[in-house]
Curated annotation (Swiss-Prot), chains A, B:
It is an enzyme of class 2 (transferase). Homodimer. It comes from Halobacterium salinarum (strain ATCC 700922 / JCM 11081 / NRC-1). GO terms for molecular function: GTP binding; phospholactate guanylyltransferase activity. Keywords: GTP-binding, Nucleotide-binding, Nucleotidyltransferase, Transferase. Pfam families: CofC (PF01983). Pathway: Cofactor biosynthesis; coenzyme F420 biosynthesis. Belongs to the CofC family. Its EC number is 2.7.7.68. InterPro entries: CofC, Nucleotide-diphossugar_trans. GO terms for biological process: F420-0 metabolic process. Guanylyltransferase that catalyzes the activation of (2S)-2-phospholactate (2-PL) as (2S)-lactyl-2-diphospho-5'-guanosine, via the condensation of 2-PL with GTP. It is involved in the biosynthesis of coenzyme F420, a hydride carrier cofactor. This is 2-phospho-L-lactate guanylyltransferase.
Amino acid sequence: MRTVVPFDPRDPKSRLAEFFADAEERRGFAYAMLADVLGAVRDAGGDPVVVATAPVSRPVDAPVTVDDRALSTAVAAAIADGPLPTAVVMADLALATPDAIRRVFAASGDVVLAPGSGGGTNVVLARTADVPVSYHGVSFRDHVTAAERAGLTVTTVDSFRLAADVDDASDLVDVFVHNTRRTREWLIAGGWRLAVDDGTPTVVREPND
Amino acid sequence: MRTVVPFDPRDPKSRLAEFFADAEERRGFAYAMLADVLGAVRDAGGDPVVVATAPVSRPVDAPVTVDDRALSTAVAAAIADGPLPTAVVMADLALATPDAIRRVFAASGDVVLAPGSGGGTNVVLARTADVPVSYHGVSFRDHVTAAERAGLTVTTVDSFRLAADVDDASDLVDVFVHNTRRTREWLIAGGWRLAVDDGTPTVVREPND
């Protein structure tokens, strides 16, 4: 299944700015997550296509098209332009596995949604071109409401691995615990490790030897 | 299936202290979530049993036993004491649905685990009495490792609804978006509502009229 993966190669994961040494390192992290998402999509039988807000500066193992419009606009255009069904999977789902993505591909409904934590929407599968797309605000609720208003059937996939987008430092704990691809290794190579601080897991960085 | 729900009636959800007016209101919130979890367990075909750290001060729709030991100790004892299989479901899983809990009950394996966000473990299903239990630190990783060392088969249920424990104010957004039982109504009755602040969903409180 055609699977669009929106990606911001310029200033990705800005809420993690303090966690990384500089923007270039932060971009490296974003590219590692992107590679994992593309691999999981492909292993699930999907054909990933990256829709980037700017030309990519590193190798990406999928066709890349550039669309510098807002996320919702670019995604709606990608759905309208392409063959159906089309899935849309966020580029920061570092916990995504082929099994989790297969559950999306296999779900019925005009629209299949996987919620993201914090009211968001991390995966949209569109089986018709007129699926309303809006990632602003409480997007999961809005996607459900808009799709039902349009007379479309909606199915939800209840997946932690698809809900856990990596937005802030606390999310990195789950990357360490649950990622089995490149992102975890990338963090380890950079000197990060999982620690427990007063009973609470956290990710800390130690100088490389 | 016998389902143990550990509950702290004295100082629950202490990380939400600043969100509520006082400890009594915070307890009210915890009891609302507990009621939702018990309802979801029962609707999934489970028989809930509350294991509380102290006597409960409000009506609870399930048998209550008091065990004031540490969480891991009390849960291990509850598994060892009771008929098998026994499931253990955290009391703050306000997003839990019967469907999500049924997936746990239906999963095979000596041990079935549902991860909690941040490295935790939110559901344990034990089919043997010697399932190692430790909620400290990176408990999901530790549960998997300890069970495999003990020669037990481990199955994981990938569920956002079971991963999303309610620990801090940002988690309340998901209660508003995804809870369909008592907790959301409890928040609304208390004057809280979902708002969008600069594109980011948040939960705010407004004075009651």
